[in-house]
Amino acid sequence: MTKKKLPLRFTGQHFTIDKVLIKDAIRQANISNQDTVLDIGAGKGFLTVHLLKIANNVVAIENDTALVEHLRKLFSDARNVQVVGCDFRNFAVPKFPFKVVSNIPYGITSDIFKILMFENLENFLGGSIVLQFEPTQKLFSRKLYNPYTVFYHTFFDLKLVYEVGPESFLPPPTVKSALLNIKRKHLFFDFKIKAKYLAFISCLLEKPDLSVKTALKSIFRKSQVRTISEKFGLNLNAQIVCLSPSQWLNCFLEMLEVVPEKFHPS
């Protein structure tokens, strides 16, 4: 008996073959016939073939040349499927609202998150992502050291749906996996200043062991820190990494109101 030939994936992707997982991912993403959905790392189309039955438009993105050819043949008659052969990091993300349902290449998880939840915050509505369990855990740490993680939680509701076993993939990964649900929050925020907000978070997290009081005093006056504490219920003695996403955003918006622009972090 000959061995089944497995695709070579330098970015660490393992193909989803679990139909229950696929169904759960699509259901969690709340896909409708009005949605444009990206399948990042589409592989052999295991997810795409289910998405095309529900979504208005599916964009299957794949970097492996042989698999791109396979996808184009497989979906040649599908009017609502577009196959794009490229590394997702070079993909021209839609300039209109879209969702993602994807078993992403594990090796570029951080890049994918930044592209979706920071660079394309304006149009990324959310979705479901199958990814390595370890980076998923870091998203839900009680203390948030990574400025991007704070940023993501500010604008998105993130939910770890469940852990996924290696038997759900081909080839089976040696690491644990998870299904992550992402849903953008309804916030009144000027997306044009998202980089300024990230700079604010990054500045205050440069010394993560500092207390909230000491960290805020690098930007605000002492009296302003006291006012902010009372206004937003801050524990000034806690570490700055213990602030909640809503507290981060409130502090930032307060900075825009009371601190001259020349003192804003950049």
From Swiss-Prot:
GO terms for molecular function: RNA binding; rRNA (adenine-N6,N6-)-dimethyltransferase activity. SUPFAM superfamilies: S-adenosyl-L-methionine-dependent methyltransferases. S-adenosyl-L-methionine binds at residues 14, 16, 41, 62, 87, 103. Its EC number is 2.1.1.-. Keywords: Antibiotic resistance, Methyltransferase, Plasmid, RNA-binding, S-adenosyl-L-methionine, Transferase. SMART domains: rADc. Pfam families: RrnaAD. It comes from the Bacteria. One of its GO terms (biological process) is response to antibiotic. InterPro entries: KsgA/Erm, rRNA_Ade_diMease-like_C, rRNA_Ade_Mease_Trfase_CS, rRNA_Ade_methylase_Trfase_N, SAM-dependent_MTases_sf. The keyword Zinc does not apply. It is an enzyme of class 2 (transferase). CDD domains: AdoMet_MTases. One of its GO terms (cellular component) is cytosol. The keyword Mitochondrion does not apply. Belongs to the class I-like SAM-binding methyltransferase superfamily. rRNA adenine N(6)-methyltransferase family. Involved in erythromycin resistance. NCBIfam families: Erm23S_rRNA_broad (NF000499), erm_F_23S_MT (NF012223). This is rRNA adenine N-6-methyltransferase.
